[in-house]
């Protein structure tokens, strides 16, 4: 993935995000992606080459390295960045589905017909649930990778000395030394802190979406017409459009599209 593709992806996600979502994208791009590209490879580039052990036994150093680093930190963070940004694609795909559905509707019934959606990118109906589901996935992914990072390396610290005991082909307990442990520990703390900030922002965005949904529902219930006014207007407008098509000769009286007026009240946007 090049920078242009990444920029287009982030711009598309940012277009349909809330204020918390835009801050989340900024944190991910500045404090995680850029820091990962600029500093991570330099800090962790020498991890296996400079992993020294006090033994000359062939293969012992590689086995001890694999024992302590089952997966490289830098590769784990790369997977985390990929998986944590993937749920945002659900929102983009749902909006694209709405736009295509709207295009086919206008192509079939004409430009004067009632729109299926006032705004295809507005988080109402199914898109609201898709957006909420993407946030829940982000939270789960963040917690999962933090758990893996904490479990695989026995905490977020980076010891100067590790010992390999009873590991073939090492003959006995072998002491191994990690290169630049302090720098790697500080970098690990920084990445964990960035993940924690993203978790807080995602949780705040979930609370904001739910609170805004509840307030909007209460406001609708307090209105005199309730929920019954909007379907009636939609049905009347759709029927007028249907009759115009009949007068123009674009539809036959016994065509399948005659059911459009009857089904108008049940056309719930997805």
From Swiss-Prot:
Cytoplasmic side: 1-20, 99-126, 211-270
Example GO BP: cell-cell signaling
Coiled-coil ranges per UniProt: none
Topology within the bilayer: Multi-pass membrane protein
MF (Gene Ontology): gap junction channel activity
InterPro entries associated with the record: Connexin (IPR000500), Connexin31 (IPR002269), Connexin_CCC (IPR019570), Connexin_CS (IPR017990), Connexin_N (IPR013092), Connexin_N_sf (IPR038359)
Domain of life: Eukaryota
Cellular compartment(s): Cell membrane; Cell junction, Gap junction
One Pfam family here: Connexin
Transmembrane annotation, as ranges: 21-40, 76-98, 127-149, 188-210
Keywords: Cell junction, Cell membrane, Gap junction, Membrane, Transmembrane, Transmembrane helix
Regions of this protein lying in the Extracellular compartment: 41-75, 150-187
Family the entry assigns: Belongs to the connexin family. Beta-type (group I) subfamily.
Function according to Swiss-Prot or TrEMBL: One gap junction consists of a cluster of closely packed pairs of transmembrane channels, the connexons, through which materials of low MW diffuse from one cell to a neighboring cell.
Assembly notes: A connexon is composed of a hexamer of connexins. Interacts with CNST.
PANTHER family per the UniProt record, alphabetical: CONNEXIN, GAP JUNCTION BETA-3 PROTEIN
Protein known as: Gap junction beta-3 protein
Species the sequence originates in: Bos taurus
